[in-house]
Amino acid sequence: LEVFKYLPGTNTGDCGEATCMAFAARLIERSRDINECPHLLKDEFKEKYIELSKLLAPEIREVKIGVGDKAVTIGGEDVMYRHKLTFFNPTAYAFDVWDTMAESELIERVNKIQNFKKFYVGTFLTLDMIAIRSTSSNPDQFANTVKKVSETTDLPLILCSFNPDVLRSGLEIVGDKNPLIYAATKDNWIAVKDLALEYKVPVTLFSPMDLDTLKSLALTFQEFGIKDLVLDPGTYPSGSQLKSTFDNFIKLRRAGIEEDQKDIAFPIMATPITAWMIHEDPVSASYWETVVSSIFTVRYGDIMILHSIEPYALLPELHLRDNIYTDPRKPVSVDAGVNAIGNPDGESPVFVTANFALTYYTVESDLSSNSIDSYLVVVDTDGIGVESAVAGGQLNAKKIKETLDKFDFDVKEKTSHGTIVLPGLAARLQGDVEDETGLRVMVGPKDSGGIPKWMEKNWPPK
C-alpha cells in the first residue's frame, strides 16, 4: 500500500499489469521497474516519481560499470540473508592482465577471459570483467596496454594503480567506457577524486583493515557529489587476518542494511588475487585464491579481482556463484513439453522427466552425449525433482497424460512400440500410468547416466 499511493491509480494496463496494485507488488519484488509506467514519467507525477524512487532504492547502492550489453551492475542488495528475499546482482568476477605483458600474451589472455563459457543448468556461465594492473608505474606503458585491451574486448574494465597519473593515462583511452578506477587511498584521494569527477566514473576506496578511514573516505567523496563508490576493506588470504577480513565484510554489509548507515552502504570489493602474494607455488596460490573467492561470494563480495583462469579454479567459483544467486522464491524450472533429442523416429524411446531444470538438463545431456535419439516428455512438476514430485503428487499419471494431450503427442501414432519410459524414482507410478494412458510403461534407471546400459538390455521392448 505504501508503494501503491505513489502510483497513478488509473489501472490502464500500460505497464503490462492489469492494475496499479499488481504493478506495486511487482515493484516490491523487483521484477518490474518504475520506468515501465509511462504515466509516472509525466511532469504531473514528477514528485511522486522521485519519492517512489527513494522508497524503492535498495539498501546497498547499485553501481554500474562498463557500457552496452556487457556492462555489469553490482550491489543493489536488500537483505543480509538470501532466504529473507533473494540476492539480485551476482558477484562480478574480474580477471587481471598487467602492463608488462608481451603483446601476444596480453591478447591471448584477454581472449581466454572473454571467450570462456561453461554450459550449466540451461545457461552459459561466463567471466565478467578485466582488471588492468599497472606493474610498470609508467603512464605511457599503462595507456598502451589499456588501448590494446579495449581494442580486443568490450568487457567492462578496472584500471588498477595507486598512481593518479597512471590512472589518468588509462582514463584518457577508455574514460568514455565507464571503467572502475582502483583505487583511492588516504594518501592519493584528492587526485583520484578529481579524476572521478572529471571522467564521471565509479571509484574504489581502499583502506586495508581500517574501517574508520574507509568510512571517512566514503563520506568525503559523497560530499563532492561522487555516489558511485566501491569499498575495499582489504583482503588477507590466510590466518587470523583472513578472519579479520571476513569480519570486516560482515560489519560493512550489516552497517549498510541493518544499521541504516547510508554513508557506507556501497558494494564491497574482495581481492582474492592477494593469495598470489604469499604462495610461491602456483597450484597452492590458485587453490587459496579459489577458497577466498568462494568465501566472499557467499559473504557479501559484490566484485572481485582474480588471477587464475584455469578450469579447476573457475568452475567451483562460477558454480557456487550461480547457486548462491539463484532466486529461492522461484523454482529453477524449464517449460513443460515434448522435446525431440537428436533425430527421433518411430523406433525411438519416449522418456518422461520432471521440469526441475537441473533434472531436465542432466537427462537431456545424458541422452545427447550418448547420441540416443529420443523423445523427452517434460511434465510440469512446479520445478520439483522427480523423487520429491512423486512423493508430493506433482508427478502423477494424470499429469503425464495431460502433458501428452496438451502438446498433441500421440505415442501410439508417433512410435511403433507405443511405450513410455518412467524414471526409476517414479517406478511406483507404472500401473497408474498404464491405466490412465493405455500405453505400455517401462521403468528406466534411477540415474539418467545409466540410460545407455539400460537401453542395451531393454530396448527395443520385447
Describe every region a protein language model picked out.
Residues 25-55:
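Non-heme iron-sulfur electron-transfer modules
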Residues 436-438:
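C-terminal amphipathic alpha-helical "assembly" element
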Residues 1-9, 45-110, 336-344:
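N-terminal amphipathic alpha-helix/helix-capping segment at the start of soluble metabolic enzymes
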Residues 29, 81, 92-221, 227-425, ...:
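Conserved mixed alpha/beta catalytic, RNA-binding, or beta-rich assembly cores of soluble enzyme
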Residues 8-26, 35-39:
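Local cysteine-cluster metal-coordination motifs and their immediate loop/turn environment
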Residues 1-6, 34, 38, 44, ...:
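Alpha/beta catalytic cores of nucleotide-metabolism and tRNA/nucleoside-modifying enzymes
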